[in-house]
């Protein structure tokens, strides 16, 4: 369900929130559930959206801005003013497809690094919207991948943990100023 929260899709010189990068402990902590969706939560959503748009991103999880909460904002069409963002509060994956596909991913918390990641082709997720209403969504393609990528952040996982080719990954990380020792491979 598209969000009713509206922010201008533009780059700010000084975004409201600071991004955290690979190696920062906050990215490795499991996020806490949001117990009450209120005006403070909605302001955080606005700030996260503005930070995401300012950073040329299509998805952002609260841990990436140092906030240990289960909150995700996504906009797969940031250049389309008519396309509203998707807000997911306390999301849980209900079902994934058996079909796996590989595609290149990047991350605002690991700038400059783009690697192929295998993920289920289809994901069904349950979540609350910005008004605290329960929602479910079945997603494929870029949106499905983005939801899975951002949900990983809520569990202390970053996309490089899912990369198979460790040699190429180590080279890419090093080339962009990151240490391979920050990677924690997941099965």
Swiss-Prot record:
Removes the formyl group from the N-terminal Met of newly synthesized proteins. Requires at least a dipeptide for an efficient rate of reaction. N-terminal L-methionine is a prerequisite for activity but the enzyme has broad specificity at other positions. It holds the Pfam family Pep_deformylase. It is an enzyme of class 3 (hydrolase). Transmembrane segments: none annotated. Keywords: Hydrolase, Iron, Metal-binding, Protein biosynthesis. The lineage of its organism: Bacteria, Bacillati, Cyanobacteriota, Cyanophyceae, Nostocales. This is Peptide deformylase 1. The active site is at 150. GO terms for biological process: co-translational protein modification; translation. Binds 1 Fe(2+) ion. It comes from Nostoc sp. (strain PCC 7120 / SAG 25.82 / UTEX 2576). Its EC number is 3.5.1.88. Belongs to the polypeptide deformylase family.
């Amino acid at each position: 369900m598209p969000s009713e929260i509206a922010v201008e899709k533009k780059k700010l010189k000084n975004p409201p929130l600071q991004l955290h990068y690979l190696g920062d402990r906050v990215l490795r902590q499991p996020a806490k559930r949001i117990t009450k969706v209120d005006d403070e939560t909605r302001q955080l959503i606005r700030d996260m959206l503005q930070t995401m748009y300012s950073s040329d991103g299509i998805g952002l999880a609260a841990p990436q801005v140092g906030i240990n909460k289960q909150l995700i904002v996504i906009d797969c069409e940031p250049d389309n003013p008519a396309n509203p963002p998707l807000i997911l509060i306390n999301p849980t994956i209900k079902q994934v497809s058996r079909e796996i596909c590989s595609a290149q991913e990047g991350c605002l918390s690991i700038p400059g690094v783009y690697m192929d990641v295998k993920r289920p082709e289809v994901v069904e997720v349950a979540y609350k919207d910005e008004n605290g209403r329960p929602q479910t969504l079945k997603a494929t393609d870029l949106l499905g991948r983005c939801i899975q990528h951002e949900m990983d952040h809520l569990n202390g996982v970053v996309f490089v943990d899912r990369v198979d080719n460790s040699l190429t990954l180590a080279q890419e990380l090093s080339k962009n100023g990151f240490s391979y020792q920050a990677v924690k491979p997941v099965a």
